[in-house]
């Protein structure tokens, strides 16, 4: 573990999680660029997870085993830190034993981190369950923005020219738009922002199959979405931003991922919710599905709890 000086504690922190994978290396590149843009210091976090003892294997000496894992992780952190130093990137390190998502979120809260950057493999099935669940848990639990970087983004940070901001016109979406606006202030003047709204039938309608009123409902929803997107875009254009709008019918997560691919988005920023249980199922799952499906990094921003 590393200690903070009083001067360090006054500088904003970008926290990057690593498991020493290729995707984590790409997350490091994105985190370093984000820290450079915002004048923040970079901290690299790794959690040592002691595998559960299986009944058909003799249990190792848990204390020695944990210490061996810790030493190996410290060595890898030192190697990565030296590699980054060779590129002119300064980074502090933090190591702890525990569940990765808990270690990451707790460390971010203790530092009041400006953002967490983490790699996600975007896999399905058992491999996703084992390898991708940490990212999903961090997205759901973190109070600060979380930037999830995908395997397709491996090979380094690329310039951000297009930011896609999905909106459902809620406070969560407004916070994500504010974050995107802030990020654009650090980017080249030719950067653009795309506002996207995906509308669909309420779940109550879909339970009954096709009904006549569904057609007029969708038409009205599309027109209302276009009107509200136009108003939002005009306000942003007055701030000197280049803005485009898209209103489309369909499943939100699918539409967001498809439009990001179609329009060459370099980053998606979107709101998420800190709910649990049934409310999380309906309100938080869209952001988590986008993190899995999107063709580019996704920054999720959680509305502060009242």
State the predicted function of each range.
Residues 27, 73-76, 176, 225-228, ...:
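Hydrophobic alpha-helical membrane-association signature
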Residues 62-75, 213-227:
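A short acidic, glycine-rich active-site loop
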Residues 1-12, 33-37, 101-156, 258-306:
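Gly/Ser-rich helix-loop-strand patches that form or flank binding pockets
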Residues 45, 94-96, 126-129, 149, ...:
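Structural motif
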Residues 18, 95, 120, 167, ...:
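Conserved residues at beta->alpha junctions
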Residues 2-61, 87, 159-213, 235, ...:
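Small/aliphatic-rich secondary-structure junction motif
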Residues 1-10, 23, 30, 60, ...:
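Structural beta-alpha unit
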Residues 90-92, 145, 192, 242-244, ...:
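Conserved beta-strand segments of alpha/beta enzyme cores
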């Amino acid at each position: 573990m590393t200690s903070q000086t009083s001067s360090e504690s006054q500088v904003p922190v970008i926290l990057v999680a690593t498991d020493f994978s290729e995707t984590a290396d790409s997350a490091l590149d994105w985190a370093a660029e984000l820290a450079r843009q915002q004048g923040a210091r970079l901290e690299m976090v790794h959690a040592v997870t002691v595998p559960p003892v299986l009944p058909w294997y003799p249990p190792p000496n848990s204390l020695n085993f944990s210490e061996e894992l810790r030493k190996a992780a410290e060595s890898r952190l030192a190697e990565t830190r030296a590699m980054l130093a060779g590129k002119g990137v300064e980074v502090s390190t933090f190591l702890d034993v525990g569940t990765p998502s808990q270690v990451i979120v707790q460390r971010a809260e203790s530092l009041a981190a400006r953002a967490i950057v983490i790699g996600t493999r975007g896999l399905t099935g058992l491999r996703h369950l084992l390898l991708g669940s940490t990212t999903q848990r961090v997205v759901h639990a973190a109070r600060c923005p979380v930037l999830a970087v995908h395997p397709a983004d491996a090979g380094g940070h690329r310039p951000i020219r297009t930011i896609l901001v999905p909106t459902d016109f809620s406070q969560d979406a407004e916070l994500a738009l504010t974050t995107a606006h802030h990020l654009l202030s650090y980017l080249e003047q030719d950067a653009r922002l795309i506002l996207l709204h995906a509308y669909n039938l309420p779940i109550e309608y879909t339970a009954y199959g096709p009904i006549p009123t569904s057609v007029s409902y969708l038409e009205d929803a599309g027109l209302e979405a276009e009107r509200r997107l136009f108003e939002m875009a005009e306000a942003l254009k007055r701030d000197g931003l280049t803005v485009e709008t898209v209103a489309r019918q369909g499943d939100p997560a699918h539409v967001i991922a498809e439009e990001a691919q179609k329009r060459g988005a370099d980053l998606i920023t979107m709101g998420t919710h800190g709910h649990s249980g049934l409310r999380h199922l309906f309100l938080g799952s869209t952001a988590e599905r986008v993190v899995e499906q999107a063709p580019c990094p996704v920054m999720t921003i959680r509305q502060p709890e009242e």
